[in-house]
From Swiss-Prot:
Lineage: Bacteria, Pseudomonadati, Pseudomonadota, Gammaproteobacteria, Alteromonadales
UniProt superkingdom: Bacteria
Keyword Cell membrane listed: no
Gene Ontology process terms (BP): translation
Pfam families hit by this protein: Ribosomal_S16
UniProt keyword Ribosomal protein, yes or no: yes
Protein name according to UniProt: Small ribosomal subunit protein bS16
Keywords, alphabetical: Ribonucleoprotein, Ribosomal protein
Species whose genome carries this gene: Shewanella amazonensis (strain ATCC BAA-1098 / SB2B)
Molecular function per GO: structural constituent of ribosome
UniProt similarity note: Belongs to the bacterial ribosomal protein bS16 family.
Single GO cellular component term: small ribosomal subunit
């Protein structure tokens, strides 16, 4: 099953997440099909917190990909910011 989820990066105590499309059987930070954005929960000042390619997300969801709860909330926030 294809899923859209967060893959953790960054340093210890400084998380940075890539939003990736992957097979659900792959490791959290392992192989992925496509990177569709990123999420930086510790962004300060003018730094970008969230960037998401909504066209590609719509493409994958339209083709049957599921999203995790957190990614679904991030997609909702990105749509609200884009409007």
């Amino acid at each position: 099953m294809v899923t859209i989820r967060l893959a953790r990066g960054g340093a210890k105590k400084r998380p940075f997440y890539n939003i990736v499309v992957t097979d659900s059987r792959n490791a959290r930070d392992g192989r992925f099909i496509e990177r569709v954005g990123f999420f930086n929960p510790l962004a300060k000042g003018q730094e970008e917190t969230l960037r998401l390619d909504l066209d590609r997300v719509d493409h994958w969801v339209g083709n049957g990909a599921s999203t995790t709860d957190r990614v679904a909330k991030l997609i909702k926030d990105a749509r609200k910011a884009a409007a």
